[in-house]
């Protein structure tokens, strides 16, 4: 007989497995899931589902690339390296530096995560008692729960990597003077 496959918004290994176990299809196609995290299948197979960067279904960068043929490549809100993998390759630094990251939204979290993976010592300061910033808030809207989940997942990833996270902490000139970081990055909006 014919092979049957299914695609579209199948975003987790659990959902893909459930569909396959129902024996209604022979194959599950997960395109956007693998744009968001090119190691999706490897991580799922290894049982590292907490490390997967899940697609949030925003359809911004991936669809824009199909609609605008002048774009050099498609992009992804969850995978800033998409289409620029070689340029964004992570290498360990030979000179670890202390970097003060002001803001615990997704930009600050991503900066801290990448810095830590490169061997630096990021100190992430969030002025409130919650990480995730506006992405967390946006995830409260109907049908946007993936945004909230992504913000929570990024916070957990930063914690697992050992990022020094300081909640209810505003970056001040006095703090900068005390810590004497090599660099300060501002990753918040107001």
Language-model region placement:
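Glycine-rich phosphate-binding active-site loops on the catalytic face of alpha/beta enzymes
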Residues: 25-40
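Cysteine-cluster motifs in flexible loop/terminal segments that predominantly coordinate metals
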Residues: 41-95
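Beta1-alpha1 glycine-rich phosphate/pyrophosphate-binding loop at the start
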Residues: 2, 101-167
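FAD-binding core/adjacent interface of flavoenzyme oxidoreductases
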Residues: 56-68, 90-92, 164-188
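Conserved small/polar residues in nucleotide/adenosyl-binding loops
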Residues: 1-8, 189-190
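Catalytic cores of alpha/beta
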Residues: 11-23
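Conserved acidic residues
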Residues: 3, 26, 182
